């Protein structure tokens, strides 16, 4: 392609989808998106391993729930449900007509005389755009472990973010490297089918109560009576995450954390940076002590 557009956006994950929603509502139509994957979803397009789920409650994580009239099925939605939701967003707001998939932007060149960007892609495109916006995120490229001898390993190997479902793990001896958020989700699922499972870790994980559950019909009926229920919930979650006092926590577990934050923020004078860091570390230590006590008991 060698044509022009007013706005060119790189990325079709949640950032790109939400940007299109905002631009469309603001009256912008001459917009084009470039996405290196084969569909929308961003990190949820690339990551499709067994057990994948969001570790933020779905009622706060999913954008535009009111506009979509959608209620997540679980408190912590699976990655597959999130991917399907991204597709529904794209279909509802006409995103697919605006996006070039399997297209990677390799470089952009500002042309001063024409006051526009020349955008070069891996498919030979040289498009012009008045504005270029990066919405490509950080979680789409696998970080491969540098392990001596991997190049001569004769068995099957792959990264979780590029899960190979053509490899049948049933009754196999499997090793998984790492115990971060991904492994915590993968290990319980593949342990159900493999013959032997070896988990290699550098640092043990600290895992708190997940409290996974289905969304109840009573909750859905209540939310239907509350305009902007998801926006309000998201605002409360943001306050909790930033360490600010929230008027109402989203659940009992977070309520305990909020009370702890509130206690630590009660002071009669402005704190120095060092004092604030000390109080934040103290709060974090108390939360981690709760987790450690749960593990030992």
Residue positions per predicted region:
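N-terminal FAD-binding dinucleotide-binding subdomain shared by FAD-dependent oxidases/monooxygenases
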Residues: 1-7, 12, 21-150, 166, ...
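Glycine-rich nucleotide phosphate-binding loop and flanking beta-alpha elements
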Residues: 16, 139-140, 183
